[in-house]
Amino acid sequence: MRREKRLNQGIIKNIAIVVQPHQEISNGPDKKYGGVERVVTFLIEGLLNRNVDVSLYTAKKCSIDCRLIYPMGLFDGEFLEKFNQTQLATYSRKIREDLENKNFDVINNHYDPITFVALQNIRTPTITTLHGPATEENVNTFGGFSECYFSAISQAQKNSYPSNMNFVGDGFVYNSIDDNHPFSDNKRNYLLSVSRLEPIKGQKNAIKIATMCGLDLIIAGNCLDKEYFHEEIRPHLTRDLSKPEKQSERSEFINDISKYQPDVRTIIYVGEVNGHERDQLMKHAKAFLFPIEVEESFGLVLIEAGIAGTPVIAFNRGAIPEIIEQGKTGFFGNTIDDLIGFTKRTSEINSADCREHIKKHFNNEIMVDRYLNLYRTIVAANYA
């Protein structure tokens, strides 16, 4: 079938996905990477399962079965973390040069403002997925291009951006998760916090909630703000398993978490976790705490908790009410006192309800369907 006829029939077969150069798009339980990387991985795998050819533009080694295109060559992670604005602009320009010589049906750019600007007026229909909040920088960049196509990752995030932006369809596609993730109703007597360690993520709040409830707390995540850690987190720790000399003890602790039964109240920091470790901690937690200090665009970790059968306790910010079913899969409130009270009510939550809610509303098949609908919409507009 000729390409133009195929596209007129809404048949999408050839997609380019663009990510930031430092992002590792890979599958496997041992990977340590953030929410955007996991979502893009799920999207690519879902598209490949629908017999859609996918080309990924990146600069970091990735282990995924799609076509990998390195416009500036392959760089190691340490170099990419120091990528400056000039190098990023060069990366974006080289992506555009390569894209202009290819016949993709659709280009899906995942978030980066510099790459977004570099892709303006390219002949292939292009949509940008916004993974981040409506900061001043993002609003100034994305809000100035009312003719471009966008998708948010929640209704709340969409509403936070300027109304003149051209959001396609409903304007958002929820992130998703593989519903084969591990589940357990064997909950142990600890609360869990998994996130980057920085003030906006609210580990300080989580410590207060756990302390006031008389419950143990396990904190996991990469430490981005050393001052915050030393001033607000470290003084409360009874064990720090993140240190290099503690790795054997740390592995044993996480692997045996299903038997967790401490003699005294503890607050434990385990450092950054990979997928397998996160699943282990998540599925046995009494509740997952998410008392963040910003308007949440989505929060992939919330659906990771739900699929594991673990209720979420969170501030009512951003997309939280779109993800948590109040009183059924967790609780959200406006103050620390609200969250302390809700944490004491976690026994009211059925683990199976948490999992079923996520499988019904946030599974990979739904996300891939909705992205394909977005692609068809912008292709149809382009060929009208």
Residue ranges of predicted features:
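N-terminal strand-loop element at the rim of the active site
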Residues: 2, 22-27, 45-82, 225
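Donor nucleotide-sugar binding/catalytic pocket of nucleotide-sugar-dependent glycosyltransferases
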Residues: 125-136, 143-182
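Conserved donor-binding/catalytic core segment of Leloir-type glycosyltransferases
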Residues: 149-151, 168-222
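Nucleotide-activated donor-binding/catalytic signature segment of Leloir-type glycosyltransferases, i.e.
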Residues: 221, 230-276
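Short hydrophobic beta-strand element within catalytic cores of glycosyltransferases
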Residues: 311-314
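Short acidic/histidine- and often glycine-rich active-site loop of Leloir-type glycosyltransferases
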Residues: 316-327, 331-333
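C-terminal "capping" alpha-helix adjacent to the active site of nucleotide-linked donor transferases
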Residues: 331-352
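A short, well-ordered alpha-helix in the C-terminal region of glycosyltransferases
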Residues: 345-373, 377
